[in-house]
Amino acid sequence: MSVLLVLFRMVGGWLLLAVVAGLISGFSNASLLAMINHSLTLPQTDRWLGPGVQFALLALLMLATRVISQTTFMYLGQKVKARLRVELTRQVSETRWLQLEKSGMSKTISVLTQDLDTLVVFFVSLPNLFIYGAVIAGCLVYLATLSVSVLGLALAAIALGSLGYRAAHGRAMGLLRQSRLREDTLIQQCKKLFDGGREYRLNADRRRRFVAGELADNIEAVRQQRTRGYVLYGLATSWGSILFFAFIGLVLFGLRDLLTLEPATITGYVMIFLYMIVPVEGVLSSLPTLASARVALQRVQQLREDLPPEQTQRPLPAEPFRSLALEAIRYQYRGEDGESFTLGPLDMRFSPGELVFIVGGNGSGKTTLANLLVGLYPPDSGAIVLNGRALAGDRQEGYRQLFSAVFNDFFLFDDVAFVHERTAEQVNHLLRLLKLQHKVRFAEGRFSTTALSQGQRKRLALLQAWLEERPLYLFDEWAADQDPEFKAVFYLELLPMLKAEGKTIIAITHDDRYFHLADRIIKLESGRIVQSAPL
């Protein structure tokens, strides 16, 4: 019951209350059976007086504690789900970007949705697990008062049923784990179906091959694995019922004379075993949910291990930006296919009010260098030197806050985290310059819309970066998908405006027409600097 121990640490006393209420309800249920069986032997004159009142009170206790147990478990299910979501999303937000890239979005989303929903279903099924378990225990205790020998037969039936269940349990668990791993791939494939929707509609053969082949095969594999797993659990449940009826028949028709059982004892025995069939099936049918919850918790724990939070951070010294240098920086990227790319060793320096262009062909390492510069990738060796001091690992968060960036695969927010000393007049001027004044308004730190074309969204991302007013700006091929008019605005008006404010601008670009505007050009080839000279 390691799952319950983990959950108990999360919710503490509430879980204990729900468990105790469920056990009381189950034992009350079993006590009602004992009262019913006992009432059959009472004299006619006494049957409806004291025992009737006791029966009513016991029934009320059973119902009240059942309601308490069920509602508490439902409440706890949602509480645990919300708590884990908060903890995991906070951990995702605090994990190094490199670790998040390696882990992948699909696995994280799957844990935050499907696995946490599995835990909620588990909580909903817990009342029956404890209530039925208590009913079974209470029935066995009552059975012991009737006949120890029959109790031994009952325990033998339960033990034999447990062995059959355990034989199926290991195989079923393995199938459920495999299906959960396949569902991660299935989420990726469904995302691919949406992300590549336009291209698929332009290539019907590709679409049909993907939907009818790769996607359908994975859906079928998930179905088969889950079906086999749950069928095994179903067979185990049926095996328990078969054994119960077999032992009822054995006692009634095979061992009755050998055990010298009285008719009242046989009646009580049969009633107890018939009464226990539903609880036993209920407990066994709840076990797959317990197994799924165990798998879900394992995946939650694995996600926590895969996304370790960054070490505790300290703020940077309160001083203006004076210089940034990369000294013998080296970084090796390893792809999923086993291929690697090495950037460096690199040496470069940046100063306030400087405009630097980084150029190079595809695969030369420009984007990797950009991630290193802004602190998203940690270097394997070398040092980042800020204002003459090597940057420590516990200063990374503060270092990243020096940058505003527009990446090539940028994300556009509809709000600005913090607007500095920009005036409404300046914002409106830039909106007009970017020809967005008729589509977007900016008020109270928020844009009125982000539902724009890709080029317009990129212009809005530039405006957002400008509003943050950081000392360093990184633009990763910002002008690549802009028409000549906005390229000219970017190079001839916006970059000089930022430079005049004393900002350091690092722009990855292929626009050789504007190379003369840079103070310095750094050219990369195969991860090495082949040119770094002022113009």
Residue ranges and their predicted role:
Residues N29-N37, L58-E101, M105, V124, ...:
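Juxtamembrane helix-loop junctions of ABC transporter transmembrane domains
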